Amino acid sequence: PETRVKAFVDAHEEWIECALEKARVRRESTIFVTPEEAEVLRSKAKEVLIPRVYELAQQFGFKPCGVTIRHQKTRWGSCSARQTLSLNCQLMLLPEELRDYIIVHELCHLKHLNHGPAFWALVQKCLPNALTLRRELRTYIIQPLDNKHVHEELL
């Protein structure tokens, strides 16, 4: 099954790269993703996001126990009490700097499992432009999987 997924991703790499580039330049967006697109995104996210989590973790001194990639309906990411990060495959449709912001945000939850002042101070220490990135992230909306609506930027 993993070989088939990789072959599928490789066969659609040009489309994936094109979709990613269009998503990077678009700032105000509602993201509609079909189940088929979600599978492509999930595969690409595993290739891109998991290594990035560990790069940023090392850079800022965090040690996550694991990373999972899923299609989440309402969250860009989460961090469990077991020190595992879960990231939404739709992160692949965001600009890289926003993906990094979300990853760092979740990594900071490894030290503070809440959104208290100490948490936000740590996020700000890691990413001095965190407030700007947080505001920009609010212009993006996660949409549930929907067979009827495909975001025109992905076509």
Question: How should these model regions be labeled?
Answer:
Residues P1-Y101, L110-L155:
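Active-site-proximal or metal-binding-adjacent scaffold patches in catalytic folds
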Residues E106:
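Walker B catalytic acidic pair
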